[in-house]
Every structure is written in structure tokens, then in C-alpha cells.
């Protein structure tokens, strides 16, 4: 008679699974709470103590760590000496192990959990049985996921045993299960002990991608086990083609921009750089201003807003070729309009503010860099002014807006704004003057030549950017400060009647 050992914390689907085994003539060995559930449902089982001849002790900490359990699992059926040993010791074979582990991850996720609670939810016997069964996969079926119950039962009913291929896959899945479990425990204990010299990351495949950044590159999208709501991994795709690698990069950049704004805000991005952005009293006005900021670059880009997307905005977007539209919600009328663009990807994202402690990981050859995300949003005040000319109230609004935008432009980054709208963006140049020239020329080409505000993500190392800005109608500048030549930049600003604010914070983006 075939025997199965059952000991689970996640009891979903268990009664049906074990009932199926019983119908096939299997004998069921069960532990503690698992046995009670099965007995309560009229399924006859054998207690683990009846198999081992030893009682469960230490409040259940020791119950399956016994040769009569592990011998029955690990014995290789094709080796006569193994089978002879089992017979001599009175050990029966165990042909299927159905085990999942104490809910450690769920326990530590609870508010106010104590270390004592966490420790009591570290499984010892469970992982041992899982690993033993997974090691002997040629003879033993290991089932640690209720999602596999149906497959296992179907094969047992059809063939009397599971296939080699199924057992191998279940073995790999089991080792993944125990590895994830131990990694979670190790991470928790290392945090408690103040140890940080190792990094464990755990992600699940969310979707394979057609290709990577370029067609000759392979790519996949992995998601954190518990992604924060304000993320692409948590986003709901309402319509459109599957997201591509570049779509995901751009959409992620868009979310990072949007999260910095509380007023109605709209941003258009291309290659992860804002090309048009605006805040306004309404989301319709913000969209119109962002679109007017750069009607050329928005083509083939993505647009994100931080308010419900309404029909009027959707109607404005309809004639434009866009890859993605992102919003916290959409009116039915807006979705109806956007639905006419079948390939347009429409993403709904919960825009609840982030906790601010998210980590960013960048792969490098032979290693990985880790840093906290740059979620810092500085509050600019007139007291930050370092020049004789003090900012007006309107300039302060533009300085604040420009500072938030330039943070999300690739360095060296310059943003030129007016009326809380971008009028020029200079990104990714190897010198700051080059980025300034690009942004300022965009503003001039748009016919905006007076009352401009310039924002720089890094300090101005010389006074040349200040002098250049003045020629294009810039009257106020915001920058981190911190150069050994700050005095030169301040003197030039004073000479030209320009207001300058030092934030004391740099926002490089590579």
C-alpha cells in the first residue's frame, strides 16, 4: 500500500486532495492540526507518533525528526541494501510528502509582531521533510503547493504514479520553496542582528518580454513578492499590447515623476526623460499645458497624470500616437474614447505615496549597486536665496516646479520653466552648459524669452551657465550649490539681476 505523509500550514484544498488519495487506496500519515482537520472531515489517518513510536514533544517542536520518517522518505527503492535496512528496522516507505511550512513571512508582516512570535513560526521538521523528499524525487512525490494537487491526483488516477518529469519539477519547486523560506528567515534575523554584508533579493517572474532594450536582447520582467501599490508590478493594464522592456522603463520613470506632485499634474516622457510637464488647477489644464510644452517629442511617448483621467483629456490624447497612458483611475467615458486606440497601453496605478524607503538596485559587471530611491522632495523657501535679488511669489512657484522636474532628467540636467510648465529640457550632456543651451534654445524656439526660471540638478561649477541663461531671458535659477566657485556664480547673478536659490541637495540621475 502506498503511503503519504501530510503536514501543512496552508490547508486550502487539502481535504479534497487527501480524499482523492484515499479513493486510490493510499494510507495517510498526518501530524497535529492537519490530522485533526482530516479526521473532522471523516478521513481516516494515522498519527505521526503511531509511526515513530515516539510522542510529539516540546510543544510540537519535535515530531517528524525521526529515522522512521526520513528513512521511509530517503530510501532508494532500486537499492536492495536500502530496502533490506528498512525491513530490518521496521520502517515503511513514504511515497508522497505533502508539506508546506509555518507562515513565517506572513507572521513578520503583521503589525506589532514580536521576535518571539517570529521564532515560533520558524519551521524545522517541515523543511527537513521537504528536502528529503525532493532529494529522493525519483521515488517520492513532493507536493508543497496546493496548486499542484490537481496535477498529482490526475497522474495518479491515470497511471498509478506521477511521471518522472512531474516529480523532477516538483522537486525543483520544493527546493525553491525551502530556499525562499530560509532566505526570509535569514533576512529577518540579520536585520535584528544588525548584519548587512549580504544581500538577498527575491522576485517572481511576472511576464516574459518579447525582447529587451533592443530586439537582439532577451528580457523578462520580475516582480517583488509584495510590490508596493505605487508600482508597475502592482499596476492594472486595462487595454493595449503587452508592455515591452522599454515601456516598463519609461512607465517606471513616469511614476517616479508623478509621485513628487500633489497638485493636478501631467507629464509626457520619452526615453525616461520628461519632455513636457505642467501643474494646473485642473487635470485637463495640466494636460493641455504639458502637451503644448513639446508637441514634437511627445510623439511615441508616454503620458502620466495624478488625477482621474476624464473624457476631455482622453479626447485630447486620441489624435496623438502614444505608447502608454497612466492614471490612478479613468472615467468610463475616457476609457470609451481610448478604446478606439487598440494598441495603446492603458495602465491604472494606485498612486498612494511611497513609504520613502524603497531600494534601487543597479546591476554592474560582477556586482550590484544598492541605494535608497531618491524620493526627497525639498521645500523651497525665499530664505534659500543667496543673491541680492530676492524671488517673487510667482518665481518661487516656478522654482519649486522646476526643481521637482529637473530631478527626473538625466544628468547633466537643465529644466527651463515658466508658469509651472516646462518650456525647455536639456538632458544627458557631458557638460552643464551644453544641457543649458539645449533647454534654452527650446524655450526660444517656442517663443518664450522673458521671465524664465532655470533649474539645474547639480551645482554650476562656473559662472558661464548664469551668463548664458541671462541672454535667454532667465530671471531666476535654482541649483544645489556646493561648488568651490559658488561665489563666482552668485556674483554673476547679482551683476545680471538674477535671483538664485541654493537647495543644498543634489539630484544626479545617470
Task: Mark where each language-model region is.
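Mobile "lid/hinge" segments at catalytic clefts and subdomain interfaces of large enzymes
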Residues: 136-149
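Hydrophobic beta-strand scaffold residues
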Residues: 28, 45, 140-142, 346, ...
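Non-catalytic interaction/clamp surfaces of large macromolecular machines
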Residues: 146-147, 151-199, 320
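Active-site/ligand-binding-proximal alpha/beta "capping" segment
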Residues: 77-124, 131-134, 384, 388-393
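Short gly/pro/ser/thr-enriched loop/turn and capping motifs at secondary-structure boundaries
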Residues: 34-37, 52-58, 104-106, 128-131, ...
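ATP-dependent carboxylate/acyl-activation modules
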Residues: 1-6, 96, 181-510
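N-terminal glycine-/serine-/threonine-rich phosphate-binding loop
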Residues: 1-51
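Glycine-rich nucleotide/cofactor/substrate-binding loop typically near the N-terminus or early
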Residues: 33-103
